[in-house]
């Protein structure tokens, strides 16, 4: 199966890039090779991405704003939100009553060096967090507050708390249905969709869904997981090295190449190498960011109470920005989903490599992710933004992109 998938992806990549280079001769004279390549790739993939976006983010009208315009909810957000609530109730609020056990498990209290797997609970947690703590906590929160007002923060926190149950479920399944061959762990939605649904007599459906997930996961990792991050990092580098006159302004590909090589050095060693790097990098990264945020907050400590007041008031105010309460709620759920990836299926791939005999133990550890990512980091970001008081500026959201 893996060879067939690899073969299909290879053919797809070959045809895509062949068509890209086939268009090169028609480029305008004087244009650079990289510029032409960028334009060609965009022209080839934009129709595909647009169609996928129209399907995935198909919006259902649920209300109207003050001007009578419909307020729409993307069906995928409703699916994620309802699933998170159902899991919370079904597992008797595991996301609220298992914190102590989660921290004990992360510290290795119930671990043994002989347990099957490749990485520790802490390494698995940081490996998964490395993919969620980032621009979603900064620009994502800024967009939520800029569009939905301070009240979006409340719904973002609430979605983060319920999302802990979704993370618990998917990561437990990732360990339960993983396969270990010659010391190497293979896990994630590809495994539990195939094997789990197979046990229910739905093997064909499971195989099809696993195949689709693998393809879409690769696409998502290229876009939101890599291109978005690299683009924003490059933009910041250009800004601090001279702006338009910076070397990287006209040679962005150089930055991309450097970043690609740096990432390649890490991932070429597999999950063990990735986990070792993230175990050292993620705590430092989060610590530096939180320290900077706390300096801002404590420097303006007198505004903290007012900021929380605006958050709670905006969450339930009928005249809230962007379509009333429903509009604010949508913004909060959107940014929480983008930030913590609860229910997306990416985290189980990292968590399935953990050393443990009990699948649910890693699910307990995984539920800490949305709490750290959304409830702590995103809330801190929102406080800084609300205290600054610039979120209602018309140009506020655009300064992040």
Where do the protein language model's features map onto the residues?
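Extracellular/periplasmic helix-exit of transmembrane alpha-helices
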Residues: 23, 168-178, 182, 292-310, ...
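N-terminal alpha-helical transmembrane segments of multi-pass membrane transport
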Residues: 5-8, 14-135, 145-150, 163
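Selective recognition of specific alpha-helical transmembrane segments in multi-pass small-molecule
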Residues: 162-170, 256-271, 282-302, 335, ...
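Helix-loop-helix module between adjacent transmembrane segments
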Residues: 87-88, 129-130, 159-185, 194-229, ...
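Flexible loop linkers connecting adjacent transmembrane helices
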Residues: 93-121, 143-153, 165-203, 391-401
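Membrane-embedded translocation segments of transport machinery
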Residues: 268-279, 284-357, 369-370
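Membrane-interface loop-to-helix entry segments
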Residues: 3, 79-82, 87-103, 213, ...
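Alpha-helical membrane segments and immediately flanking helix-loop junctions
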Residues: 114-147, 173-176, 182-196, 212-218, ...
